[in-house]
Regions:
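Structural signal for hydrophobic packing residues in well-ordered secondary-structure cores
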Residues: 37, 41, 56-63, 67, ...
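Short, solvent-exposed loop/turn elements at beta->coil junctions and helix N-caps
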Residues: 54, 113-115, 317-323, 403
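Residue-level signal for inorganic ion chemistry
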Residues: 11-12, 33, 48, 70, ...
Length: 446
């Protein structure tokens, strides 16, 4: 069997048709990784650091090639694709220093002489299941910390990003068995979850729940990032023009295909009317690339049609664009009734609803009403209001006077509720996730 990816801007353009690994091939990849892991860990901090440093250099040298491939395979705008390639380089360099970081602590004994140590050790083989929307950065931010602390890894990318994953692994050029890509779909993903020693997953809520259940049954660590319905709050004292710029970028950037994209805009009091006009104007003029496929396009147009039937007003976009690709004009809707899927679900496209709120309390209640919240933004000139909102919002990541998108790679990444499960990704949190703590007690022999 093969797995194929197509250019979202020109669906007739077949990017790759790769042989799938199958269950047996995935199992074999895990076995090779398990055989390579003791040597990779025992090679020491200097060897692992140097390998990740060389990988960063290789990705940097091929950055333009990788960006062009991301444009072609997943429809990412060139500027964003270049930024993603640069981010992958920065992540590799950041984690190249991690092997030298302290891996434990020394503690005092409760009584008498002795030495108490805590040490962190790798789990073994990390199973990495990644989505298509960040085909360079997400595989790197999962693999780099896992490898830095001495795990080996098997990567199962989304079918739509197969070519990016395979080329990325070639460039990293790690020793045999240290990082293996297994092309495929559900079969390969399920086998990897069933055989790896630790699993990191980013993808849909439905699949993520199955991954969580499978890993819980095996008693192995898992982290799952499942996206969410992200809200932006705009207060009456905000710079409306600046807020509209940020919101348009967070709704329409990369066609809204980011876990941190804004899906719900909540305008407080007098901010509603000027924001409605400013944001509709920007989204109408926004240049927006294609969505990932025909099914995604159908889901977006169906959501707009359903909302309008239910009484919503379409303020911008909401239609398929002309041309051969899977283009969708960024949509803004008002008067979407409570309970409509656009107010409860993530649609993973350039579509947002505009909601009024009488005051900050109501705005926060609306933002926190969803069962999954990854990111939120607050737009205000008042520091006290910003800090109060940040303290009360349920989102895992909160940005003040900034888009919900664009979080920093060296900070913990994750949401709340059903948006995430397990320990955070990125930064030092990832190093803890990919290791287990062990306590060592040394007492005098006599």
């Amino acid at each position: 069997m093969t797995v194929s990816s197509y250019n979202p801007a020109d669906p007739a353009d077949l990017v790759i048709a790769a042989d799938t690994a199958g269950a047996l091939g995935t199992q074999a990849a895990v076995e090779r990784a398990r055989a390579a892991q003791p040597g990779w860990h025992a090679a020491g901090a200097a060897a692992r650091s140097a390998a990740l440093g060389r990988a960063a250099d290789a990705v940097e040298a091929a950055a333009e090639e990788l960006a062009a491939l991301a444009v072609r395979e997943v429809g990412k705008p060139l500027a964003e694709a270049r930024a993603e390639a640069a981010r992958a380089v920065a992540i590799l360099r950041y984690y190249a220093q991690a092997p030298y970081a302290p891996s434990g602590a020394v503690h005092e004994t409760a009584a008498g002489p002795g030495l108490l140590l805590t040490r962190r050790r790798p789990h073994g083989v990390a199973g990495l299941v990644t989505p298509w929307n960040f085909p360079l950065a997400i595989p790197v931010w999962k693999a780099a910390p896992a490898l830095a602390v001495g795990n080996t890894a098997v990567l199962k990318p989304a079918p739509e990003a197969t070519a990016c994953a395979l080329r990325l692994a070639e460039l990293l050029d790690l020793p045999e068995g240290v990082l293996t890509v297994v092309p495929g779909g559900a079969t390969e993903g399920a086998e990897l979850v069933d055989t790896a020693d630790v699993v990191s997953f980013t993808g849909s809520t439905a699949v993520g729940r199955a991954v969580i259940a499978a890993t819980a049954a095996r008693g192995i660590p898992v982290q799952a990032e499942l996206g969410g319905l992200n809200s932006a709050l705009v207060l009456p004292d905000a710079d409306i023009e600046q807020a509209a710029d940020h919101l348009a970028a967070a709704v329409a950037g990369y066609a809204g295909q980011k876990c941190t994209a804004t899906g719900q805009v909540i305008a407080v009091g007098a901010a509603y009317e000027p924001l409605r006009e400013a944001l509709a104007k920007r989204l109408t003029a926004a240049e927006c690339g294609p969505v990932i496929g025909e099914a995604a396009l159908d889901r977006l147009t169906g959501a707009v049609d359903s909302a309008r039937t239910a009484g919503a007003a379409l303020l911008a976009g909401g239609r398929r664009t002309d041309g051969p690709g899977w283009g969708f004009a960024p949509a803004l809707l008002a008067d979407v009734p409570a309970g409509h899927p656009l107010r409860t679900e993530e649609f993973f496209g350039p579509i947002a609803v505009l909601l009024p709120a009488a005051d900050l309390d109501e705005a926060i209640a609306l933002a926190n009403a969803g069962r999954h919240t990854l990111a939120a933004s607050v737009h205000t000139r008042d520091l006290d209001t910003a800090l109060a909102a940040a303290d009360r919002l349920a989102a895992g990541m909160i940005r003040i006077n900034a888009p919900t998108t664009g979080v920093d790679f060296h900070l913990p990444f994750g949401g709340t509720g059903s948006a995430a499960y397990g320990e955070r990704e990125q930064g030092a949190a990832a190093l803890e996730f990919y290791t287990a703590s062990r306590t060592v007690t040394l007492l005098p022999s006599a």
